[in-house]
């Protein structure tokens, strides 16, 4: 179903409510990574160019008690956004009431306002997170049209996305549009061959994704901690490696269903301890010593995965290949990241989270077609689930 995008709306002289994802990491009141703010700029700038009034709002962290408010204000975000836009961003330190309403009424065309953390509404009965209908209706009453550009929360039905959209004409912002196009494209209509690379620690986190992608992808390459549950399902010794014992039968079923579509590592980098200081070495996947644990894929697996990627037209990657925060066990993730980045004739997509962080740390971000801004949202999209934040946007 085609959704309206911001370019479909008449924005001149309009009060434009914009749900952005400014859930940025902070330390001592300072923003440590402003990627999410930068990602929202095209939508905000377009609204201002069209002489709309931009009324922005976002959540920041979890807020359950008054004490939780400490360090969760969006004030530093307003200051950073103002620097990035090169113009004043009016900050309103509340989520409802006369102060906010007056500030919106006084807003002129081409001006920007950011109001306080939407999750401050969660202190009294989780009104934001539980999509309180009165709150959604109230926020909707503050604007003429609604633009949802927060893909990172699209898998949640909150008052600030679904609640407003059910009361007001709405459209996707440019970032949301891009996410629907690329992440949705993997599920709906990928250029083939489609190769999925899935990593991370737990099978339980990725079951839905593996099941769905086995029906869509030409190959599914599996790395990371969840590998060992699959190896155990094949009757291999995995030593002290991470094992989800209650998921072995399920892994067995997935292996049977997948046939040669599912590709597992052929070697592992092992150590006796989960530490960067402990000695480590590489062994073949079927001979992990009883007193050691696998913490990364080895070079033979990097080579195998690189070979499987050749000729792919669409690649989607979600989850690291090993404990990449420890440098001794980061080579698998780096190797896979490089292999995908070097593909010249493919649409390459990273499904957010740790993989996105890895690509950025390695300086490969610009080598990928699309890096998703939503970890949980992109995973649920890849599972084939309908995302409430997307479904609630007006159809064209």
Curated annotation (Swiss-Prot):
Pfam families associated with the record: PGK (PF00162)
Locations listed in the record: Cytoplasm
Statement: the UniProt record of this protein carries the keyword ATP-binding: yes
Residues the entry annotates as binding substrate: 21-23, 36, 59-62, 119, 156
Keywords assigned by UniProt, alphabetized: ATP-binding, Cytoplasm, Glycolysis, Kinase, Nucleotide-binding, Transferase
UniProt GO molecular function: ADP binding; ATP binding; phosphoglycerate kinase activity
UniProt pathway annotation: Carbohydrate degradation; glycolysis; pyruvate from D-glyceraldehyde 3-phosphate: step 2/5
Top EC class for this record: transferase
A Gene Ontology term for the protein's cellular component: cytosol
Superkingdom field: Bacteria
GO terms under biological process: gluconeogenesis; glycolytic process
InterPro entries per record: Phosphoglycerate_kinase, Phosphoglycerate_kinase_CS, Phosphoglycerate_kinase_N, Phosphoglycerate_kinase_sf
Residues the entry annotates as binding ATP: 206, 294, 325, 352-355
UniProt main location, coarse: cytoplasm
Reactions it catalyzes: (2R)-3-phosphoglycerate + ATP = (2R)-3-phospho-glyceroyl phosphate + ADP
The UniProt record lists the keyword Transferase: yes
EC code(s) of this entry: 2.7.2.3
The family this protein is said to belong to: Belongs to the phosphoglycerate kinase family.
Subunit and interaction comment: Monomer.
HAMAP family, per database record: Phosphoglyc_kinase (MF_00145)
Protein name (database record): Phosphoglycerate kinase
Organism: Listeria monocytogenes serotype 4a (strain HCC23)
């Amino acid at each position: 179903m085609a959704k309206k995008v911001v370019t479909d709306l008449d924005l001149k002289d309009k009060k434009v409510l914009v749900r952005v994802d400014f859930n940025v990491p902070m330390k001592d009141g300072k923003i440590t990574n402003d990627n999410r703010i930068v990602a929202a700029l095209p939508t905000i700038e377009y609204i201002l160019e069209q002489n709309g009034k931009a009324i922005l709002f976002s959540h920041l962290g979890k807020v359950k008690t008054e004490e939780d408010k400490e360090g969760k204000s969006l004030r530093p975000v307003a200051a950073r956004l103002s620097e990035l836009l090169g113009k004043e961003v009016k900050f309103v330190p509340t989520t409802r009431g006369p102060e906010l309403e007056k500030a919106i009424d006084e807003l002129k065309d081409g001006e920007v306002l950011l109001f306080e953390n939407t999750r401050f509404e969660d202190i009294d009965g989780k009104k934001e997170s539980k999509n309180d209908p009165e709150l959604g209706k109230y926020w909707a009453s503050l604007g003429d049209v609604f633009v949802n550009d927060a893909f990172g929360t699209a898998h949640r039905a909150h008052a600030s996305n679904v609640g407003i959209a059910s009361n007001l004409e709405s459209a996707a912002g440019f970032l949301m549009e891009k996410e629907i196009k690329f992440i949705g494209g993997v599920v709906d209509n990928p250029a083939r061959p489609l190769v999925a690379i899935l990593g991370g620690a737990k099978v339980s986190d990725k079951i839905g994704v593996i099941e769905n992608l086995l029906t869509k992808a030409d190959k599914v390459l599996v790395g990371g901690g969840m590998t060992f549950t699959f190896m155990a399902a094949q009757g291999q010794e995995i030593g002290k490696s991470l094992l989800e014992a209650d998921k072995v039968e399920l892994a067995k079923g997935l292996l049977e269903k997948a046939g040669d579509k599912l590709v597992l590592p052929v070697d592992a980098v092992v150590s006796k301890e989960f530490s960067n200081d402990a000695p480590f070495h590489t062994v073949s996947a079927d001979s992990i010593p009883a007193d050691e644990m696998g913490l990364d894929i080895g070079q033979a697996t990097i080579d195998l995965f690189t070979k499987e990627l050749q000729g792919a037209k669409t690649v989607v990657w979600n989850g690291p290949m090993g404990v990449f925060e420890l440098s001794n066990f980061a080579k698998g993730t780096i190797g896979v990241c490089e292999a995908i980045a070097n593909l010249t004739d493919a649409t390459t997509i990273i499904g957010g989270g740790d993989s996105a962080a890895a690509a950025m740390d390695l300086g490969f971000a610009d080598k990928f077609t699309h890096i998703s801004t939503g970890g949980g949202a992109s995973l649920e999209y890849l599972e084939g689930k309908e995302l409430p934040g997307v479904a609630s946007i007006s159809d064209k």
